[in-house]
């Protein structure tokens, strides 16, 4: 099992304020174990052990006891969790377990050792707790599961891991719905408390993604789309930081860097960087950018990330950030690294690289390449590369974008492609592009209407010289509107 020594990482296992406050309250309410014994709800053995364990105040005393009675400790805690129904007592037990693990990470082994003796795994003891109603109980169980999974020598796998990751995704998606203004059922939990519980869930994810194997499982579970969904909606800076932290962790794996190319990560992070007022958010975005350029083993992948950053005006942001002073040396080092690498990429940037990067970012604008006759003459056929990858992006933008400038430029580019590539009409029709362009001929924006009309005429007409003369009368209006 591979674990990373993660530079500058905060301890994701630290509880949020609401969990810490509730845990302190729970610790103060001691349990009358004798009454449970008299009611025959627990065994004399478990009652005797838990009372002795509670009396051990110092970490050294606890450690000495656990070294000789680790198996009994795991057995007692699991018996108490499974035989007692009272919520307050279950909370107390989980808090004791969490405190014990936080005090010494190696103590997770007592649960794995006990489970192995019972020919079981540790997960079935804790995963059912995620279905309980009380939010503190649920989130304490989630924290314990993450610690066992991240700190233990045995990986969580198969249906157990899928179940846990699906639970995390559901909790994060509930935050996404709150951010979008959709009503979410939260019971008696206030909005502020709910937000802190979601931060606790994000902390569990941060802990899990420190382990390389879990990164692959998270991506396979469509976890990246979940993260991007949270980032694309309004969320507090702490959750924003935690989600970007998770992306940063994913980008430690070269294979993950390759896989993450298919998501629109760079534009989203560059937007957040532009608006960020928190140094910790700035720091983690720069660290993520650095990982994308540094951990990627394929030159093409590194170049694609660099071009996406250039397209999203990250160079300008870095130049502005360079003028500021930071307490954290990592920020200055990352800024220097990124400026150097992006500067090298700018030198190697061809017009086609520029066009490709702009198109993949989904943020089309009237940059010079779109109007360059030379560009289209030399590069129209290159839009067919990689099974028409760029053309598919172009037609998709015509379908999903609501930005008039993006639609106008996309329609224009479709027209230029069919004008310069002999079989372009057939390709565009097969991709559904012709109908998409025609749909915009009655768009409310004049620029979209004009460029859609022009593209449709290029799809229909064979005599380009005649078409050029026909459109001359409308062209001055367009130029004026564009300026």
From Swiss-Prot:
Subcellular location(s) per record: Cytoplasmic vesicle, Clathrin-coated vesicle membrane
One function term, GO molecular function aspect: enzyme regulator activity
Xref: Pfam families: V-ATPase_H_C, V-ATPase_H_N
Superkingdom, taxonomy of origin: Eukaryota
Positions bearing Phosphoserine: 483
Membrane topology type: Peripheral membrane protein
Entry-linked InterPro entries: ARM-like, ARM-type_fold, ATPase_V1-cplx_hsu, ATPase_V1-cplx_hsu_C, ATPase_V1-cplx_hsu_C_sf
GO biological process, one term: regulation of macroautophagy
Keywords carried by this UniProt record: Cytoplasmic vesicle, Host-virus interaction, Hydrogen ion transport, Ion transport, Membrane, Phosphoprotein, Transport
Tissues and organs where the protein is expressed, per its UniProt entry: Widely expressed.
One Gene Ontology cellular component: proton-transporting V-type ATPase complex
Assembly with partners or alone: V-ATPase is a heteromultimeric enzyme made up of two complexes: the ATP-hydrolytic V1 complex and the proton translocation V0 complex. The V1 complex consists of three catalytic AB heterodimers that form a heterohexamer, three peripheral stalks each consisting of EG heterodimers, one central rotor including subunits D and F, and the regulatory subunits C and H. The proton translocation complex V0 consists of the proton transport subunit a, a ring of proteolipid subunits c9c'', rotary subunit d, subunits e and f, and the accessory subunits ATP6AP1/Ac45 and ATP6AP2/PRR. Interacts with AP2M1.
Protein task: Subunit of the V1 complex of vacuolar(H+)-ATPase (V-ATPase), a multisubunit enzyme composed of a peripheral complex (V1) that hydrolyzes ATP and a membrane integral complex (V0) that translocates protons. V-ATPase is responsible for acidifying and maintaining the pH of intracellular compartments and in some cell types, is targeted to the plasma membrane, where it is responsible for acidifying the extracellular environment. Subunit H is essential for V-ATPase activity, but not for the assembly of the complex.
Family affiliation: Belongs to the V-ATPase H subunit family.
Protein name according to UniProt: V-type proton ATPase subunit H
């Amino acid at each position: 099992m591979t674990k990373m020594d993660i530079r500058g990482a905060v301890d994701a296992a630290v509880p949020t304020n609401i969990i810490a406050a509730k845990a302190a309250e729970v610790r103060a309410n001691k349990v009358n174990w004798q009454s449970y014994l008299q009611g025959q709800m627990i065994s004399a053995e478990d009652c005797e052990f838990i009372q002795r364990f509670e009396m051990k105040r110092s970490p050294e005393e606890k450690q000495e006891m656990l070294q000789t009675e680790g198996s009994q400790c795991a057995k007692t805690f699991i018996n108490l969790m499974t035989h007692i129904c009272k919520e307050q007592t279950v909370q107390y037990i989980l808090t004791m377990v969490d405190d014990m693990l936080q005090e010494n990470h190696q103590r997770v082994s007592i649960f794995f050792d006990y489970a192995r003796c019972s020919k079981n795994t540790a997960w079935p003891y804790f995963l059912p707790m995620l279905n309980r109603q009380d939010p503190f109980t649920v989130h304490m169980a989630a924290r314990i599961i993450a610690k066992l999974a991240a700190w233990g020598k045995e990986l969580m796998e198969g249906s157990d891991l899928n179940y846990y990751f699906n639970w995390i995704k559901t909790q994060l998606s509930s935050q996404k719905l709150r951010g979008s203004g959709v009503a979410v059922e939260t019971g008696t939990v206030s909005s502020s408390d709910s937000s802190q519980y979601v931060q606790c869930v994000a902390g569990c994810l941060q802990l899990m993604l420190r382990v390389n194997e879990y990164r692959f499982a998270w991506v396979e579970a469509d976890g990246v789309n979940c993260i991007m969904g949270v980032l694309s909606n309004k969320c507090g800076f702490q959750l924003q930081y935690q989600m970007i932290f998770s992306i940063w962790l994913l980008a430690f794996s070269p294979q993950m860097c390759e896989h993450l190319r298919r998501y629109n990560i760079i534009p989203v992070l560059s937007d957040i960087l532009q608006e960020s007022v928190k140094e910790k958010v700035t720091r983690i975005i720069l660290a993520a950018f650095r990982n994308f350029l540094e951990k990627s083993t394929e030159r093409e992948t590194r170049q694609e990330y660099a071009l996406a950053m250039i397209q999203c005006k990250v160079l300008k942001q870095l130049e502005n950030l360079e003028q500021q002073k930071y307490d954290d040396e990592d920020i200055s080092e990352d800024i220097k690294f990124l400026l150097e690498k992006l500067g090298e990429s700018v030198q190697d940037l061809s017009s086609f690289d520029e066009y490709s990067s702009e198109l993949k970012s989904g943020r089309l604008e009237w940059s010079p390449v779109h109007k360059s006759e030379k560009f289209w003459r030399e590069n129209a056929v290159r839009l067919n590369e990689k099974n028409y990858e760029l053309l598919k992006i172009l037609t998709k933008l015509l379908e999903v974008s609501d930005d008039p400038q993006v639609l106008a430029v996309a329609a224009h580019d479709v027209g230029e492609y069919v004008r310069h590539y002999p079989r372009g009409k057939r390709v565009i029709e097969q991709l559904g592009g012709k109908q998409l362009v025609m749909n915009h001929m009655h768009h409310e924006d004049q620029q979209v209407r004009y460029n859609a009309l022009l593209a449709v005429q290029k799809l229909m007409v064979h005599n380009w010289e005649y078409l050029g003369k026909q459109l001359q009368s409308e062209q001055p209006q367009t130029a004026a509107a564009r300026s």
